[in-house]
């Protein structure tokens, strides 16, 4: 009994030790299952997150996304992932662990719901992108249509501009033709006037009241030492030639009384050059008078008769309207060389009812002399000043060349230009007579004067 008791006593600890070992082994198993289950869940979440990350950030692919499902065929597999190439990834759990499927079903449902939401968001985003692309496409179409309309409008404007250019060209051609016709008409009028004058002179000679008899009577007038202002028979002189024929044959200032201006005005008479009897209407000699004047000054005259002066366009017109006049221009350079130009036909505003409105056009022809013809090309032109542009140039020739003259486009002579001393660097803006000294030499002395055409006895 003692022995049995010993066995019992000794055996009891062994039985208690065996139960304790079972309990420890069972606790370790639960811990191990829990750890494995946690690892499996974490692995499933990680794989699912990786798949979602790849679906969200990677470029679009034609391959279908992996399919995540529970494996009904293998009860030990927690999750099965099927790839596009039909391969599978199974996540297993220990069969000795407690049943985790109720919790895993919830996790699976949540994962599938997240995937569905992600797909829905992608579909919504894709729909928005399609709407945006459609809107952009419509806007681009509208812009293309607008550009097409603008191009069509531009083509229309271009055609209109081309048409206007052609019309302007035609108008310019017509203007040139009209100017040519007017010039030819003026020449014909001048010729007609000359013919009429010749007829009148013929009639005068036939009636016995011609100028030759008057000249013979005047040549028997008082001697040149006497200085009465007027003709010997008491009639008023019309110009310096009448004064000369009355016996007053010294240079100086005299009064003349044109037919259409009986109150008269004073002029300077050149009684020595080429037989005398010249009425001076322009002189340049020292630059003391500014000839860059306006229209009114050139119409009425300025300066001093005994020095530099311009008699005035209106007075020149009144003188040359009386009979046929010739023009003499005397020139001198700074080397004291001299030359002259003689025009047997000269007049200002000969065929004008209102010469000022017509611009006091010049008529000049029949050149002889030593200076060359630098005025003939100006015949028929109106007078231009810095404030009255009557020339054919786009610019005002008077302003451009600092003078006043019967400019065309622009000049071959400029006797009312700046008083410069001989050669100058500027172009054609001095006292120029191009046929004698060119366009860059300003003359020292000029004198323009008129006298009735001389008649043979």
Curated annotation (Swiss-Prot):
Gene3D superfamilies: Gamma Fibrinogen, chain A, domain 1. The keyword Cytoplasm does not apply. It is a single-pass type II membrane protein. The keyword Kinase does not apply. GO terms for cellular component: collagen-containing extracellular matrix; extracellular space; membrane. SUPFAM superfamilies: Fibrinogen C-terminal domain-like (SSF56496). Ca(2+) binds at residues 389, 391. Residues 55-457 are extracellular. Residues 231-454 form the Fibrinogen C-terminal domain. Disulfide bonds join 240-269, 397-410. It is found in: Membrane. Residues 1-33 are cytoplasmic. The record marks 401, 411, 427-428 as: Implicated in ligand binding. Residues 1-20, 216-235 are annotated as: Disordered. GO terms for molecular function: chitin binding; metal ion binding. It holds the Pfam family Fibrinogen_C. PROSITE patterns: FIBRINOGEN_C_1, FIBRINOGEN_C_2. Homotetramer; disulfide-linked. Acetyl group-binding receptor which shows a calcium-dependent binding to acetylated structures such as chitin, some N-acetylated carbohydrates, and amino acids. This is Fibrinogen C domain-containing protein 1-A.
